[in-house]
């Protein structure tokens, strides 16, 4: 089947919005921040000849819904379990960036619907908040002043760890891209939720499923380090798969490479 945007009715009036395409073993994708399910469309296109790919649109990034600055990801976990029940067969859950944290939280709550998990550079908290003690506060202050470009620059440099030169391009991006502009406040909510969760390594150590961790050789160092630390506590972790020429956005820049790694992992069951 071709990709169709669907809505699953649930007890929550918001329901669950997702795309569903292909047939075969199920891959359930949880996108990262500042995006929606379309960020993984290229990877899905590589996978659908052999797999059914279901891509949720995280409620945090559904701009028709009210913002939820106090989110703790619990509702997003609810959505994923509702969608897994609707799918009705075991799946491999794939999460990217903050979406990887949501995927981990989903498996921690109840691993039964899943046979495995793929996480691509989850920005887990290890000690101090991601982005430092004042990163989110400073980004929110920029938003309050009507400067979403500055907020995104703070996020990109302090939280993601990109060079300052990249950060200074963010105000330009926000001016010319209305979609990105609309998602900047949601991204800051997302980051604050991650920091609010704190260090969850003990909880993630309870995940017995096979887990494939992905990282890029050109990714900011702290994201690679967080990935390595997570791999050490997961009892079912496979060797970390490093994409030497990629960074944090290989789903867009190298979809065939990401699809190969995900596909090989799914076929291993």
For every predicted segment, state its role:
Residues 126-175, 190-191:
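Helix-rich cap/lid subdomain of alpha/beta-hydrolase
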Residues 22, 86-89, 265, 269:
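Glycine-rich phosphate-binding loop signature in dinucleotide/nucleotide-binding domains
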Residues 42-45, 54-94, 98, 257-260:
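Active-site loop/oxyanion-hole signature of alpha/beta-hydrolase fold enzymes
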Residues 243-256:
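Catalytic histidine-centered segment of alpha/beta-hydrolase-like enzymes
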Residues 57-62, 123, 244-247:
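Short beta-to-alpha linker loops that shape the active-site pocket of alpha/beta-hydrolase fold enzymes
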Residues 90-128:
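Conserved hydrolase catalytic core segment
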């Amino acid at each position: 089947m071709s990709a169709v945007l669907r809505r699953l009715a649930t007890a929550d009036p918001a329901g669950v919005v997702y795309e569903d395409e292909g047939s075969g073993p199920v891959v359930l994708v949880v996108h990262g921040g500042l995006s929606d399910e379309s960020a993984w469309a290229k990877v899905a296109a590589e996978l659908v000849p052999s797999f059914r790919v279901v891509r949720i649109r995280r409620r945090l990034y559904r701009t028709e819904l009210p913002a939820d600055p106090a989110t703790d990801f619990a509702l997003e976990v609810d959505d994923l379990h509702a969608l897994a029940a609707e799918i009705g067969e075991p799946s491999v859950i794939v999460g990217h960036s903050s979406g990887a944290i949501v995927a981990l939280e989903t498996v921690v709550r109840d691993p039964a619907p899943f046979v495995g998990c793929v996480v691509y550079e989850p920005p887990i908290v290890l000690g101090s908040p991601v982005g430092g003690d004042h990163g989110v506060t400073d980004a929110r202050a920029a938003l309050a002043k009507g400067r979403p470009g500055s907020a995104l620059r703070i996020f990109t440099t302090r939280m993601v760890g990109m060079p300052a030169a990249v950060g200074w391009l963010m105000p330009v991006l926000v001016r010319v891209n209305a979609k990105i502009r609309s998602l900047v406040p949601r991204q800051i909510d997302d980051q604050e939720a991650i920091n609010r969760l704190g260090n969850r390594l003990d909880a993630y150590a309870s995940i017995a499923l096979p887990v494939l961790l992905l990282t890029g050789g050109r990714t900011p160092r702290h994201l690679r380090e967080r990935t390595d630390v997570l791999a050490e506590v997961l009892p079912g972790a496979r060797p970390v798969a490093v994409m030497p020429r990629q960074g944090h956005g290989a789903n867009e820049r190298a979809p065939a490479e990401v699809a190969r790694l995900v596909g090989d992992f799914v076929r291993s069951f």
